[in-house]
Amino acid sequence: MKTIEVDDELYSYIASHTKHIGESASDILRRMLKFSAASQPAAPVTKEVRVASPAIVEAKPVKTIKDKVRAMRELLLSDEYAEQKRAVNRFMLLLSTLYSLDAQAFAEATESLHGRTRVYFAADEQTLLKNGNQTKPKHVPGTPYWVITNTNTGRKCSMIEHIMQSMQFPAELIEKVCGTI
């Protein structure tokens, strides 16, 4: 998979055509351009072009804090989120979304997140079970992480709050998100 850098205006336009949480930019562009994975490109046009020097573009996924805030607000307003009847399901959906927005920042936030006697996040279920048989570890969908789920809602809110603060979300959004768990 290749990555390209686009300006904020174009990114916002593409992101505004998102149909569901987690939809990739490739899926959005394919839909917008009515281009399927199976379709073949038209016959190539050959034309000699002289390039003074090769253009090297380091492509980076660009997600500004504004884009992350928008994604979280969209999640809170989504039918998928509203349909979650249990706090643990909303918690898991929030974790998946935060990871999808910035996996590196999520990883850094979870490394520093643990209790006095408990580990909250791990790469496997056994690590969490070593810290207590009653931790009810669950795999966070779309991530390599497992999380303990037998905590009360307040602790789940604290965990989300820590991750979102570490990922530099605005305080009012963090408060709003925690109020929905």
From Swiss-Prot:
Segments forming a coiled coil: none
Consequence the record notes for mutating residue 149 to A: Strongly reduced DNA binding
Outcome of substituting residue 150 to A/D: Strongly reduced DNA binding
UniProt cross-references to InterPro entries, sorted A to Z: Arc_rbn_hlx_hlx, Ribbon_hlx_hlx, SeqA, SeqA_DNA-bd_C, SeqA_DNA-bd_C_sf, SeqA_N
GO terms of molecular function: DNA replication origin binding; double-stranded methylated DNA binding; hemi-methylated DNA-binding; identical protein binding; protein homodimerization activity
Gene3D superfamilies documented for this protein: Met repressor-like, Replication modulator SeqA, C-terminal DNA-binding domain
Any one biological process term the GO annotation gives: nucleoid organization
Principal location listed in the UniProt entry: cytoplasm
Resulting phenotype, residue 152 to D: Strongly reduced DNA binding
Compartments reported by the entry: Cytoplasm
Region (Interaction with DNA): 87-88, 116-120, 150-156
One GO term describing the cellular component: protein-containing complex
Keyword terms of this UniProt record: Cytoplasm, DNA replication inhibitor, DNA-binding
Family statement: Belongs to the SeqA family.
Biological role stated in the UniProt entry: Negative regulator of replication initiation, which contributes to regulation of DNA replication and ensures that replication initiation occurs exactly once per chromosome per cell cycle. Binds to pairs of hemimethylated GATC sequences in the oriC region, thus preventing assembly of replication proteins and re-initiation at newly replicated origins. Repression is relieved when the region becomes fully methylated. Can also bind to hemimethylated GATC sequences outside of oriC region. Binds, with less affinity, to fully methylated GATC sites and affects timing of replication.
Entry remark concerning the domains of this protein: The N-terminal domain is required for multimerization. The C-terminal domain is involved in DNA-binding.
HAMAP family assigned to the protein according to its UniProt record, in alphabetical order: SeqA
Subunit structure: Homodimer. Polymerizes to form helical filaments. Dimerization is sufficient for DNA-binding, but oligomerization is essential for function.
Protein name: Negative modulator of initiation of replication
Organism in which the protein naturally occurs: Escherichia coli (strain K12)
